[in-house]
């Protein structure tokens, strides 16, 4: 850049020197300053010596350098010629243009002097004629002005004589403002001539004014009159020099009492908003409550304006009244939003309140009502957002609890499916609707809403976070997993149906997978950003954390459902094993009734999970022995078939027990309790595992004789087939059933199992009896 700037500076310098040499009268003057310090090789100096320069160049340079210098000087000479030509042409064009301009100016000025002379003559002629007219009309003008003054005086005199009659007409028509204006206009004359020429007029006028003063005082203290009318009466009394300072306390007290009529009470707010909307569509809206309220507030503001002028020392009390009106407006708004209010109704009532604030602020700007209202509006808006989320949570809770979930309907019908679908719709549609209402808050054009846009977005994010956390806590309370201080909906945990717990678990999964992502999209699209002030008491919306919360809640609720169902079966088993004396048990003749009840409970679990949970991939797991060959899970049953018929019962029992324990050593390890998945098969399998584990523990607490042990053997053998059909992990079920038999044998005084033919006969008899019972039930 520096190498390019140097030639430009040299060229500009050369152009300046050319201009100076062209216009300077003496060329020596323009170059005298530079010739002092010029060297002998400066070709542009006046003291340049060509011969000396050439001698120096020949001595210092070779032929190649001389040729280059020759070419360079030829180019410079050519450039100088070109620049000089351009300079001459440009100045020549300017001279021609200036000449043309001078010619036009001369042509325009030509003839102007004659026109100016004619104009001067005409002006002198007009002036002389005007002087003549003034001289001729001077005497008549004085007479006309005298008559005009006389006429005005007569009109004033006539007005004074007509004043009593005018005042009486004003009294009849209650035009007290005109009466005061007439009387104050006539006062200067009445003061001067009231005791002489206009004595009667003055007396009659004063009598009329006394009546007017009484009427104005009556209006001033009348409760039926509007605030504005009373303020006008006070102004008129002050114009009549009536002392009103003594009335100040009563007037301000009445003004304070009028605040009650200006409040927007919660029971009237909805009607006020509806009438305000409908009044915009009608031509005559004088009778609408919104219009009436607007007129009342406007009258109140005008009264404050008048009282401020009448009583200058009462400003502080007027400020207090205006602030009280504003504060009461927002207090009633907070009461109004405690019930369910739509965003449109809330905005409607907020606009009315804000219009009142703006109107009062115009009258009393020193009261700083805008700042006070802005703080109150922040509190009200924040409460409204929180109330919206609270109402949504209540809707979801009502949807879950409005169905009377009893045992029969939950199992035989599809009530759980209906409850789940209704609650899912309530959550998804409810969140969609609430964010549509919140969008109206951001779209509102009222000034305070525009200023608080970031705050509103922050409150919505914070409210969403708190809503989902509160909803998760409520789910746990509704399920009986956690307790509540007020015992939700009057239901104790022992009366909560297990089906509701299952619905809550699946609903938590739905919220995690569907609702929270949609809410995240809504917030990102319309409510992003936010003010840090909105997050001062907690974090903003964190979808990842909420998903983890509901994922954990769904697992807790699903496990709670399994525990509830298992506990019911456990109670059944406890009654079964504590009732008889197992040491004196009789010989088994049939499968015990508790087995039917146990299977019935498992059937109910299966029907419930089919309504709520999806079906998983059904895989049955087989166990293998140490050699890898498939075996049945009950090694003890195999040994029964392989025993020799010649053995005695005692020897057979001891050998069978020994082989059972020996087979356990070679069995492959079976995982009994695995993670519960949200599938029908997983829930049923886990429930069966826990029930069998409870059965095993109850067996270990008893002591059996031979018949008692055989009864346990018969019951367990009957359970094998239906349980394997219901679960997906046959290996674990076989293992647990074997464990029950082993536990019974360990607690038996005389371990002699039933023969397989007898077992089969008793089981077949039970199956036939159950089939007959089912047929009779269907036919009936």
Swiss-Prot record:
Keyword Acetylation (UniProt): yes
Tissue expression as described in the entry: Expressed in primary and lateral roots, shoots of seedlings and flowers.
Keyword Lipid metabolism appears in the UniProt entry: no
GO CC annotations, alphabetized: cytosol; EARP complex; GARP complex; recycling endosome
Biased amino acid composition, Low complexity: 626-639
Record's compositionally biased regions (Acidic residues): 273-284
Phenotype seen when the gene is deleted: Leaf vascular tissue patterning defects: simpler leaf venation with distal non-meeting of the secondary veins and fewer higher order veins, a narrower leaf with prominent serrations, and reduced root and shoot growth. Normal early endocytic events, but disrupted cellular trafficking. Reduced vacuolar targeting resulting in expanded expression of PIN1 in leaf margins and altered expression pattern of PIN1 and ATHB8 in secondary veins.
Principal subcellular localization: Golgi
UniProt-listed InterPro entries: EXOC2/Sec5_N_dom, Vps51
Short name of any one Pfam family annotated for the protein: Sec5
Compartments in which it is found: Golgi apparatus, trans-Golgi network; Recycling endosome; Prevacuolar compartment
Domain of life according to the entry: Eukaryota
Disulfide linkage: none
Span list, region Disordered: 270-292, 615-651
Keywords: Acetylation, Endosome, Golgi apparatus, Lipid transport, Protein transport, Transport
Residues modified to N-acetylalanine: 2
Biological processes, Gene Ontology terms: autophagy; endocytic recycling; leaf vascular tissue pattern formation; lipid transport; protein transport; retrograde transport, endosome to Golgi; vacuolar transport; vesicle-mediated transport
Protein family per UniProt: Belongs to the VPS51 family.
Subunit architecture: Component of the Golgi-associated retrograde protein (GARP) complex, composed by VPS51, VPS52, VPS53 and VPS54. Component of the endosome-associated retrograde protein (EARP) complex, composed of VPS51, VPS52, VPS53 and VPS50. Interacts with VPS52.
Cited function: Acts as a component of the GARP complex that is involved in retrograde transport from early and late endosomes to the trans-Golgi network (TGN). The GARP complex is required for the maintenance of protein retrieval from endosomes to the TGN, acid hydrolase sorting, lysosome function, endosomal cholesterol traffic and autophagy. VPS51 participates in retrograde transport of acid hydrolase receptors, likely by promoting tethering and SNARE-dependent fusion of endosome-derived carriers to the TGN. Acts as a component of the EARP complex that is involved in endocytic recycling.
Protein name: Vacuolar protein sorting-associated protein 51 homolog
Annotated source species: Arabidopsis thaliana
């Amino acid at each position: 850049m520096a190498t390019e700037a140097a030639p430009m500076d040299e060229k500009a310098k050369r152009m300046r020197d050319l201009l100076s040499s062209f216009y300077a009268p003496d060329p020596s003057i323009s170059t005298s300053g530079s010739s002092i310090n010029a060297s002998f090789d400066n070709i542009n100096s006046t003291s340049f010596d060509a011969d000396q320069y050439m001698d120096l160049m020949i001595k210092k340079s070779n032929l190649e350098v001389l040729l280059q210098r020759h070419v360079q000087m030829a180019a410079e000479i050519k450039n100088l010629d070109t620049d000089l030509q351009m300079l001459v042409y440009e100045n020549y064009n300017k001279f021609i243009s200036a000449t043309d301009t001078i010619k036009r100016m001369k042509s325009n000025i030509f003839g102007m002097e004659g026109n100016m002379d004619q104009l001067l003559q005409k002006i002198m002629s007009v002036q002389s004629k005007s002087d003549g007219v003034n001289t001729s009309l001077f005497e008549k003008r004085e007479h006309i002005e005298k008559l005009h003054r006389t006429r005005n005086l007569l009109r004033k005199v006539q007005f004074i004589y007509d004043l009593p009659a005018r005042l009486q007409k004003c009294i009849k028509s209650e035009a007290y403002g005109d009466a005061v204006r007439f009387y104050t206009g006539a006062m200067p004359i009445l003061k001067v001539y009231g005791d002489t020429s206009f004595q009667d007029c003055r007396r009659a006028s004063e009598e009329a004014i006394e009546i007017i003063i009484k009427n104005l005082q009556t209006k001033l203290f009348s409760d039926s009159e509007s605030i504005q009318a009373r303020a006008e009466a006070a102004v008129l009394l002050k114009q009549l020099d009536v002392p009103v300072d003594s009335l100040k306390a009563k007037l301000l007290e009445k003004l304070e009492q009028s605040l009650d009529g200006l409040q927007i009470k919660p029971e009237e707010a909805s009607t006020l908003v509806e009438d305000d909307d409908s009044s915009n569509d009608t031509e005559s809206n004088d009778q609408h409550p919104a219009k009436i309220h607007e007129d009342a507030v406007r009258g109140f503001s005008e009264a404050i304006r008048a009282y401020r002028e009448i009583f200058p020392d009462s400003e502080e009390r007027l400020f207090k009244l205006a602030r009280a009106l504003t504060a009461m407006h927002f207090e009633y708004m907070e009461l109004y939003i405690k019930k369910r209010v739509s965003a449109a109704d809330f905005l409607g009532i907020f606009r009315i309140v804000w219009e009142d604030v703006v109107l009062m602020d115009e009258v009393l700007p020193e009261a700083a009502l805008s700042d006070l209202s802005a703080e109150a509006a922040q509190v009200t808006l924040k409460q409204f957002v929180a109330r919206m989320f609270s109402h949504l949570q209540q809707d979801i809770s009502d949807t879950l609890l409005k169905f009377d979930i009893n045992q029969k309907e939950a199992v035989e019908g599809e009530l759980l499916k209906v409850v789940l679908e209704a609650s899912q719709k309530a959550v998804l549609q409810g969140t969609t609707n609430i964010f549509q209402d919140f969008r109206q808050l951001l779209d509102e054009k009222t000034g305070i809403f525009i200023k608080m846009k970031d705050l509103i977005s922050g409150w919505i994010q914070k409210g969403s976070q708190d809503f989902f956390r509160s909803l998760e806590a409520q789910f746990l309370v509704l399920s009986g997993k956690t307790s509540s201080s007020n015992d939700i909906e009057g239901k104790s945990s022992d009366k909560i149906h297990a089906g509701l717990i299952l619905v809550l678990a699946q609903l938590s999964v739905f919220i995690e997978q569907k609702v929270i992502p949609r809410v995240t999209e809504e917030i990102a699209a319309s409510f992003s950003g936010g003010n840090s002030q909105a997050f001062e008491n907690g974090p903003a919306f964190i979808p990842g954390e909420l998903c983890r919360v509901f994922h954990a809640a769904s697992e807790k609720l699903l496990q709670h459902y399994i525990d509830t169902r298992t506990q019911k079966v456990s109670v059944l088993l406890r009654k079964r094993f504590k009732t008889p004396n197992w040491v004196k048990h009789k010989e088994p003749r049939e499968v015990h009734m508790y087995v039917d009840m146990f299977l019935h409970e498992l059937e109910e679990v299966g029907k419930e999970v089919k309504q709520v949970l999806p079906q998983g991939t059904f895989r049955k797991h087989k166990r293998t022995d140490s050699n890898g060959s498939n075996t049945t899970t009950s090694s003890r049953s195999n040994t029964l078939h392989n025993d020799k018929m010649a053995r005695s019962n005692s020897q057979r029992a001891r050998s069978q027990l020994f082989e059972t324990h020996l087979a356990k050593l070679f069995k492959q390890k079976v995982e009994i309790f695995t993670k519960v998945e949200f599938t029908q098969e997983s829930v049923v399998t886990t429930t069966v595992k826990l029930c069998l584990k409870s059965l095993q523990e109850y067996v270990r607490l008893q002591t059996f004789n031979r018949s008692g042990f055989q009864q346990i053997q018969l019951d367990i053998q009957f359970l094998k087939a239906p349980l394997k059909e219901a679960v997906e992990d046959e290996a674990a079920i076989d293992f647990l059933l074997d464990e029950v038999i082993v536990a019974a044998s360990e607690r038996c005084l005389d371990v002699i199992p039933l023969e397989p033919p007898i077992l089969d006969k008793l089981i077949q008899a039970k199956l036939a009896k159950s089939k007959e019972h089912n047929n009779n039930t269907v036919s009936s």
